[in-house]
Every structure is written in structure tokens, then in C-alpha cells.
Amino acid sequence: MENWSITVPCFGGELDLEEVMNAKPDSETQKVQTKTEPKKTEQKQESAKKSEGPKLAEDQCAYFNEHIELKVAVIKSVECNPQGDKLYIETMDDGSGTDRIIQSGLRPYLSEKDLIGQHVIIASNLAPRKMKGVESRGMLLAADYTENGKEKVELLTAPWAPAGTPVVLEGADESFQKPAKIDIEKFCKVEMRIKDFTAQIAGKKLTAASKPITTTKSNDCEIC
């Protein structure tokens, strides 16, 4: 699952040094602050716009049915990416006859044994992306939850469905042809959530082989 965030600590030593080197009388400092305030306000507004991300589609179910391809894949093997301390390299059978490699930031949460053999749900038409020297073709879907004060991750799985089974909204046409590739911005135009321990989009259930995708521990949270 490649969209899992990796937190980087921020060190504030530069601020202390700047205060020592550029100390000014109160009146002068106030003038400088007055001159720079408009620029800071503009920067904050620009930053806020960037953090908003892509807007959700007006009709999320229709958009999902037309653009986003999910399918079941079986994890055959797992290895650690030596260049990324949180990344697994997962080799999967996606039903196409050719192995698919997906990277996900699950090492802090799940062991290799937890992953091998799982019938996971993947975003299969996301454009390939190189991460830490290895091309990742798609994204593994999961949800998070808290247990005993500790953040944990639960895979979205469909153990009853063979590799390659389409994952669609209830009642949707499984044979509908979707784009071969979409970018992450298009993928993020739909919000997938766990509600009542069931994967849903705008109140409609996600299914594999006509059976709903459910969780056992994650609930009332976003799928990522």
C-alpha cells in the first residue's frame, strides 16, 4: 500500500541560531514583522490549498464504476526493501498469468507471515511508480484501528475469491472496461470507508464474487 505516510522528524535548531544572530530591539523587530506578515499570510493560504488535495467526484459511485479498478490478488512472497525501512516488496498473483509487484509501508505493522497467502484487495490500474529503486504496480488496500493505545493495520481481504476476481460496488457490472492506467489524483476522487465493518463508497458496499468485503477490527475509518 504505497500511500501510507512516513513521518519525518523536524528539528528546530535553526530557529535558535537565527534568534541569536538576528536579535533586534523591539521596535525594529515589530517593523520587520509588519513587513513580512502579508507574505506569510500568502504562504499559509497557498499551503492550505495544497493540503486540500483533489476534490471528490460529485457522484462517487458512478466515478468509481467508470475509472477505478480493484481486484483480488494473492500474495505469493514478501521481502524487505533494503532502501526503505518501512517498505515491503510483495509479489502477487493477480490472475493475469504474470506476477505483479506492489510495495507497501506495512513493515511496522505486519510480519511477512501475516501477508503471505492473503487474498488482498488491490488498486490494479494505478499507474506504476518507482519507490526506493523498485517499481510498484498498484496499491494494496487496508484500514487502521487502535488496540491498547497502539495503531494497527488490517488488510482488506476476500479469502473466498480467486486471484483476478473484480471488486465492484454491489449491483455493478463486473465486465465494464475501465482505463488501463489512472493517476493517484483520479484515484483519490473517491472516498472509500469502512462503515459497520463493511467496505463502502457513498453507502454502497464493495463486493468480490457478490460477497461484501468486511473487516473484523477496523470500523468508521478511511480505507487507504
Stretches with model-predicted labels:
Residues 1-224:
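Phosphate-backbone binding interfaces of nucleic-acid-interacting proteins
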